[in-house]
Amino acid sequence: MRIHLLLIAILTFAGAATAAEDQAAAWSDAGQMVVVTTPGWSADHGTLRTYAHTADGWKEIGQPAPVTVGKAGVAWGLGLNAPREDGPVKREGDLRSPAGVFAIGEAFGYAGKADTTMPYRALSATDYCVDVSGSPQYNRIVDARVVGEQAVQGSTEPMRRDIHAHGDQRYREGFVIEHNPQQRAQGGSCIFAHLWKSPADATTGCTAMAPALMQRLLAWLKPQDHPVFVLLPEPAYAKLQAAWRLPALGEGNR
């Protein structure tokens, strides 16, 4: 009986380890990682670090920097990791930034070109990110001239905020965080890294930062390195760091 129970325990442990490795495999080709940690699920601010993968493992690049996240904190999103429910779960309009591991999508901005090798979208006055759940264009940046005005009807995310929102500069530079690429209804949409209005202003679900930090990220990110974006509360990061093969964070992580 004891041998039988021991065998069950070994098999259970092995299965759990394999599952963790399988999850980490989804970003095993990542050579660059942008890591944001927050003090907890309800915090609206965090710390951003950048890492490059070397033969010796993850190496921190540059200095940690402050960022702001959702006004209501963070919640598990839909990215490269398996869906989780050991914490809040991201929903459309909940004012939370999605937590997990995500591919980094195209860069975007108001200028015709940017200092980046990432795919870049020069935004126009007719570009919208559709946040209307149930729309075929849900969670997509589209040009109303191409998809038609009706396709963006009801969307609250014009990408040229300087034109549509009284000179707002927050989308002057940014990049897409690939949350909910499968367009799950009410799963959350239009998640970006973008400029902050001020260090004290949290977001409606994105991650915001100083212009100098954004410029450093855009110049550093390389599409051939398959960069990923990680956002986790510190307790969740500590719990998942080894299994998800994430960088070990330095001290003073606040």
Model-derived segments and spans:
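Bacterial N-terminal signal peptides
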Residues: 4-14
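Cell wall/extracellular polymer interaction/catalysis modules
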Residues: 20-204, 212-254
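Short, intrinsically disordered, charge-balanced linker/junction segments flanking boundaries
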Residues: 15-19
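A conserved hydrophobic position in a structured secondary element of the catalytic/binding core
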Residues: 209
